[in-house]
């Protein structure tokens, strides 16, 4: 089968935003205008196409990033058909992992902001993730029809809060109820969409006389930004020559692809205005798979040779699995992005991360929760495979004759855990199966059995995250569970270096004995300096410990890290240097050295000024002005550190850092303090030393 759409006409984009910026409605309109959807789905009545899990429809928030394929030939049918693969990403902080996953496989992104609320805390998180993966982006300022809408204020916030370089591509004509259309600053024309056909058709008109001066000023700003793309254009501009529309677009595109500017569009998805022009901007300014750098990887050749794969059908097949979803009808769906080559249904592929071969059964292209079966996928495609057995998020799928491991994704550690137990004996077995499936889908969700209490513990990124997991167990797997009180994921660390700590395990009891002897130094690592939070240096000279026992020493210490000496929490940011020891020709064994290492570790840890670390959350509260004092007082009582406040149209925004352990039940308290008028967001910021009294209470409660 030949390629139907040239790869240069592909756009793999994410639509990303703060909760309530109207992202799902925006995606719905995209699907409507691209001719996929014939009746517009509204989020308000739970009918939106992209929100396909029941919990999403009930809660009106997007949880799973569904991937959808659509085609667009331009608002005025001015292009050849372009294939747009859209990944819808959630806007709630507890689902940041979903955003991280989708950013990894996107080529470009549309950031949706609310014209009233502007740049919110979650917008900043998403922005950092887009920066990390160097994703070129444009912005769409939505809800221009709402009370308090102010386009240029949001443009200012993109500059000040995100440190970006926003360049408006349009201006809003009117605002709130008077919002009627936009000024196209490239063409210098007003665009008015036709309400009668839900904005499918439009007219170019003259710019309203009272906006001409403002439009001229921002047109000039746009031209200057374009001219900065090259010396040649700058000379032309400074020489007083007009830049052509084609030159302007080409120059702006180049600057967006280089992540130098963010083009800003606006509209009201709900009122069917602006989304159409934003789609044109996706085609004009966001990259195709051939415009972004080749993906890096390492060859599976035992030497970890660096390699790259270009977006071409001619190169060997390589793809990244970025999401696993359980579908009630077909079982496991593995969403993957093809970076190079071609694969057909029925082909055998290699999961190079697990060194396992899999057979591609059926391949489907998703449109929200409808699916279309296809025979092959090519470089640049995003699709889902049915029936892959052992694939986890972040695995590489590739041609078995040309194995490569693409860059792995990094997933955050959970910060909150709860105990769950099945309500009945019948639920017991089903619960294990359900939790296993859900953990496979979501790498930021963990499940384990607590060795002391024998309880099943689930851990995730926040209370809402775990609520939804428990909810899904009930709905999708019919498992009823009792849920315990949330527990904080503390950590343990050391604050000083200790040297020459000895650990000796020697047993002589008739026949062969056991003998292992190690001497180690232990030192703190700078938080975040080592992704594993642990380093092991083998500094043994002259074979005082034979090489075959060194891994056992490392393993013995790593086992101790899982449950620290203070209160049984994981130990982080610690370095070990093994530099001396001794062995016995007959009595030494791996087990003996493992035990010697664990003895040395416990001994050293006690002397190295151990501390308990607690997760600190970044909290932002928006409250009416008259409640500011109460809200700040309450945050202080929760050991919160105030980091500033600012006035907003709707009241006051308070920034604080608060320990997670003090934030349980905060939503209820905030509601009663402000009669339900305040809202807050919270996301993990860092681990910090817990004060003595808090640490003591935690240690005593753990019975250590």
From Swiss-Prot:
The molecular function terms in GO held by this entry are:
GTP binding; GTPase activity; guanosine tetraphosphate binding; translation elongation factor activity
Q: Where is the tr-type G domain?
A: 8-290
User: What does the UniProt entry say about where the protein is found?
Assistant: Cytoplasm
Could you list this entry's UniProt keywords, alphabetically sorted: Cytoplasm, Elongation factor, GTP-binding, Nucleotide-binding, Protein biosynthesis
The record's Gene Ontology cellular component field reads: cytoplasm
Q: Where does GTP bind?
A: 17-24, 88-92, 142-145
**Matches recorded under Pfam families:** EFG_C, EFG_III, EFG_IV, GTP_EFTU, GTP_EFTU_D2
- Main localization category: cytoplasm
- Which GO terms fall under biological process for this protein? ribosome disassembly
Q: List the disulfide bonds.
A: none
The protein's matches in NCBIfam families, at most eight in alphabetical order, are given as: EF-G, PRK12740.1-5, small_GTP
Described by its record, this protein's role is as follows:
Catalyzes the GTP-dependent ribosomal translocation step during translation elongation. During this step, the ribosome changes from the pre-translocational (PRE) to the post-translocational (POST) state as the newly formed A-site-bound peptidyl-tRNA and P-site-bound deacylated tRNA move to the P and E sites, respectively. Catalyzes the coordinated movement of the two tRNA molecules, the mRNA and conformational changes in the ribosome.
The record's family statement is: Belongs to the TRAFAC class translation factor GTPase superfamily. Classic translation factor GTPase family. EF-G/EF-2 subfamily.
Q: Supply the name of the protein.
A: Elongation factor G
**Taxonomic classification, please?**
Bacteria, Pseudomonadati, Pseudomonadota, Gammaproteobacteria, Enterobacterales
């Amino acid at each position: 089968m030949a390629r139907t759409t040239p790869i240069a006409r592909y756009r793999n984009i994410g639509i990303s935003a703060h909760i309530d910026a109207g992202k799902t409605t925006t995606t719905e309109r995209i699907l409507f205008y691209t001719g996929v959807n014939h009746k517009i789905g509204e989020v308000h009545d739970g009918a939106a196409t992209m929100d396909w899990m029941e919990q999403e429809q009930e809660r009106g928030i997007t949880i799973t990033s569904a991937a959808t394929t659509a085609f667009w030939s331009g608002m005025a049918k001015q292009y050849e058909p372009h294939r747009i693969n859209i990944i819808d990403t959630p806007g709630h902080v507890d689902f940041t992992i979903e955003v991280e996953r989708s950013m990894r496989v996107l080529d470009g992104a549309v950031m949706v902001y609310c014209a009233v609320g502007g740049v919110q805390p979650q917008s900043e998180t998403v922005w950092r993730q887009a920066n990390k993966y160097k994703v070129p982006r444009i912005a769409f300022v939505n809800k221009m029809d709402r009370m308090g809408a102010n386009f240029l204020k949001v443009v200012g916030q993109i500059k000040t809060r995100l440190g970006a370089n926003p360049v408006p591509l349009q201006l809003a004509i009117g605002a709130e109820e008077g919002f009627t259309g936009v000024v196209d600053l490239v063409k210098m024309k007003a665009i008015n969409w036709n309400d009668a056909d839900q904005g499918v058709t439009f007219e170019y008109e003259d710019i309203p006389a009272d906006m001409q001066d403002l439009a001229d000023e921002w047109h000039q700003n746009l031209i200057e930004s374009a001219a900065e793309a090259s010396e040649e254009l700058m000379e032309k501009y400074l020489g007083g020559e007009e830049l052509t529309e084609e030159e302007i677009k080409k120059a702006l595109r180049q600057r967006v692809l280089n992540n130098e500017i963010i083009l800003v569009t606006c509209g009201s998805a709900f009122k069917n205005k602006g989304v159409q022009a934003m789609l044109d901007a996706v085609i004009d300014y966001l990259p195709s798979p051939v415009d972004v750098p080749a993906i890096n990887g390492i060859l599976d050749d035992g030497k970890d040779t660096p390699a790259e794969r270009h977006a071409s059908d001619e190169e060997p097949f390589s793809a990244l699995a970025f999401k696993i979803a359980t579908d009630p009808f077909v079982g496991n769906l593995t969403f993957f992005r093809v970076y190079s080559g071609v694969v057909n249904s029925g082909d055998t592929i290699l999961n190079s991360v697990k060194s396992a071969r899999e057979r591609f059964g059926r391949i489907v292209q998703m449109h929200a929760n409808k699916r279309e079966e296809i025979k092959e996928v090519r470089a640049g495609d995003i699709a889902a495979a049915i029936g892959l057995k052992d694939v986890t998020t972040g695995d590489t799928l590739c041609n078995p004759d040309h194995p490569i491991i693409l860059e792995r994704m990094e997933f955050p550690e959970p910060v909150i855990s709860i105990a769950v137990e099945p309500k009945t004996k019948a639920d017991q077995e089903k619960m294990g199966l359900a939790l296993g499936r859900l953990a496979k889908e979501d790498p930021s969700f963990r499940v384990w059995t607590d060795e002391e209490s024998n309880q099943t513990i689930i851990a995730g990124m926040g209370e809402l995250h775990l609520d939804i997991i428990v909810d899904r167990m009930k709905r999708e797997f019919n498992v009823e569970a009792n849920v315990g009180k949330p527990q904080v994921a503390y950590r343990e660390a050391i604050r000083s270096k200790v040297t020459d700590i000895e650990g000796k395990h020697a047993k002589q009891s008739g026949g062969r004995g056991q003998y292992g002897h190690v001497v180690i130094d232990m030192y703190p690592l700078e938080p975040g300096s080592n992704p594993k939070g642990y380093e092991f240096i083998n500094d043994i000279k002259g074979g005082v410990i034979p090489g075959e026992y060194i891994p056992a020493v490392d393993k013995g210490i790593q086992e101790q890290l899982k449950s620290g000496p203070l209160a049984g929490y994981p130990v982080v940011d610690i370095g070990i240097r093994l530099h001396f020891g001794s062995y016995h020709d007959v009595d030494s064994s791996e087990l003996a050295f493992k035990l010697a290492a664990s003895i040395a570790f416990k001994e050293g840890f006690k002397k190295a000024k151990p501390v308990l670390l607690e997760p600190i959350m970044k909290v932002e509260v928006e409250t009416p002005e008259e409640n500011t004092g109460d809200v700040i007082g309450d945050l202080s009582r929760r050991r919160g550190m105030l980091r500033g406040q600012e006035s907003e149209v709707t009241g006051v925004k308070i920034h604080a850092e608060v320990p997670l352990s003090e934030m349980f039940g905060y939503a209820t308290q905030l509601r009663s303090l402000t009669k339900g008028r305040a809202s807050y967001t919270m996301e993990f910021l860092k681990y910090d030393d817990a004060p003595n009294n808090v640490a003591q209470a935690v240690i005593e409660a753990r019975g250590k």
